[in-house]
């Protein structure tokens, strides 16, 4: 199932083809519209020339911050997101040899997949569940027991049209409102 999250084919294609771009998009997917979050990896790549975990991890924090703040800013909170993305890239570079796809490649089961994703900077319980849903529904990553760790609500993993994007937005908005009660 193709990814239709950013409203821009080239940005969606990058998410489909580059595991690091996918993870960066998932990190950015908070407190901004989904289209903005999932366009972010493409825009970051355009500004940097490529998406290389080791290169991003080794950048001066102020330099990456400036890239995130360049207009239009990559996120509503560019400084915080630059730090989170840099930490994520640092872990991908050191723990997985710069290969973000190695995080889910050859996992033995859903428990291991959930452990690996939850160890990533910026990935709390909800984001882990959403990521596992995305990996299963969009990329066929379905190790034994993955369902126990997947989101049981309509997420970006279920988006395949404008209508399902609106539904995912509505679910996200309702969950946020319920969390504030």
Per-range role (PLM):
Residues 1-13, 17, 110-119, 125-181:
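C-terminal accessory module of base-excision DNA glycosylases/AP lyases that mediates lesion recognition
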Residues 11-21, 31-33, 75-80:
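Structural motif
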Residues 16-19, 34-37, 43-44, 107-109:
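Short acidic alpha-helix initiation/capping motifs at coil-to-helix transition points
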Residues 30-39, 92-98, 139-142:
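Short helix-capping/linker segments at secondary-structure and domain boundaries
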Residues 44-119:
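Alpha-helical ds-nucleic-acid-binding substructure associated with the helix-hairpin-helix region
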């Amino acid at each position: 199932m193709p990814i239709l999250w950013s409203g821009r084919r080239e940005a969606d294609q990058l998410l489909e083809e580059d595991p690091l771009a996918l993870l960066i998009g998932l990190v950015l997917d908070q407190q901004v519209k989904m289209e903005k979050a999932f366009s972010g990896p493409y825009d970051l790549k355009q500004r940097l020339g490529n998406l290389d975990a080791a290169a991003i991890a080794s950048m001066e924090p102020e330099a990456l911050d400036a890239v995130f703040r360049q207009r239009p800013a990559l996120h509503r909170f560019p400084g915080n997101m630059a730090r989170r993305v840099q930490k994520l890239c640092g872990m991908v570079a050191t723990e997985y040899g710069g290969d973000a796809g190695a995080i889910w490649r050859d996992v033995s089961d859903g428990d291991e997949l959930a452990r690996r994703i939850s160890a990533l900077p910026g990935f709390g319980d909800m984001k882990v569940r959403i990521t596992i849903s995305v990996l299963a529904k969009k990329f066929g990553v379905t190790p034994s027991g993955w369902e126990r760790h997947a989101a049981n609500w309509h997420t970006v993993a279920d988006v395949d049209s404008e209508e399902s994007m609106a539904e995912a937005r509505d679910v996200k908005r309702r969950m946020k409102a319920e969390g504030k009660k």
